[in-house]
């Protein structure tokens, strides 16, 4: 009989082994209740909301919005067997750090810190809209911390006309409520879905700093790069991602990308179809298991 192998499996293998448990834990109660951790690294502190236990999954929010947008989705994913980590972007919640020179590289470093301190190996990164830029750069710069990447509501490489203007109105509390709702319904919510909850939750005071942060590094440096497999979840009614651009990323990265369209969802997606998103992520992770 050969001697027992006492060497621990690599972290990517451990992720796979833990992911196998998802088939048993789907719908089961999360093993750990919701709580917060404050990670400190020199002048930086990252406020992280934690749900559940299991392989690490990091949720990254959209432009000018914070991680509390994911409350419902985080609970569903935790109940499906993940340890869900939600680092608040700098300037939101209790997350702090230098804002001068903030860019996607710095934001990705905060994600890597979260995975290093609270993960149990490389994590699944789930980025919503602007958050998917952070996830992509984290995968590029910190591949050892990233097992896979899920894109929620990733816009087309070049924004279609009108959507950025609608965002500017919808996110501005000084604008008339009727105009904001019109912008939300046009650019974020599918027909029949209630846009009113998103009148709240914006951080317009951070608009300029995050707009500047999103420009560095330029998209050309990271759009065609992926160390990890990618699930590109698109809303069927998302004006930021016209049907003609469905395979835009897959055409560049090939078989690393799986494209799936979520019905009755637009750019907001997360509050519109949390159950469909959860199901898609869990099924895709199962498919990654060798």
Please place each PLM-identified region on the residue numbering.
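Conserved HGGG/HGGXW glycine-rich cap/lid loop of the alpha/beta-hydrolase fold
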Residues: 49-94
């Amino acid at each position: 009989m050969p001697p027992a192998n006492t060497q621990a499996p690599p972290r990517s293998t451990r992720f796979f082994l833990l992911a196998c448990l998802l088939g048993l834990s789907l719908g089961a109660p999360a093993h750990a209740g919701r709580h917060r951790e404050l990670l400190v690294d020199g002048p930086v502190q990252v406020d992280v909301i934690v749900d559940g236990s299991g392989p690490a999954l990091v949720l990254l929010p959209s432009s000018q919005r914070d991680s509390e947008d994911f409350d419902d989705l985080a609970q569903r994913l935790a109940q499906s067997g993940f340890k869900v980590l939600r680092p608040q972007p700098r300037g939101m919640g209790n997350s702090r750090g230098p804002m001068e020179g903030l860019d996607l590289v710095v934001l990705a470093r905060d994600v890597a810190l979260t995975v290093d301190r609270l993960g149990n190996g490389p994590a699944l990164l789930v980025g919503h809209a602007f958050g998917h830029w952070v996830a992509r750069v984290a995968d590029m710069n910190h591949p050892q911390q990233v097992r896979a990447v899920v894109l929620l509501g990733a816009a087309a490489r070049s924004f279609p006309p009108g959507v950025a203007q609608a965002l500017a109105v919808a996110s501005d509390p000084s604008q008339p409520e009727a105009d904001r709702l019109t912008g939300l319904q046009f650019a974020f919510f599918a027909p029949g879905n209630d846009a009113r909850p998103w009148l709240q939750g914006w951080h317009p005071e951070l608009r300029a700093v995050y707009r500047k942060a999103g420009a560095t590094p330029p998209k050309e440096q990271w759009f065609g790069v992926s160390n990890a497999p990618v699930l590109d979840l698109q809303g069927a009614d998302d004006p930021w991602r016209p049907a003609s651009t469905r395979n835009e990323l897959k055409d560049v990265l090939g078989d690393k990308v799986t494209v799936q369209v979520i019905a009755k969802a637009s750019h907001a997606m997360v509050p519109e179809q949390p159950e469909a998103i959860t199901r898609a992520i869990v099924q895709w992770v199962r498919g990654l298991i060798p």
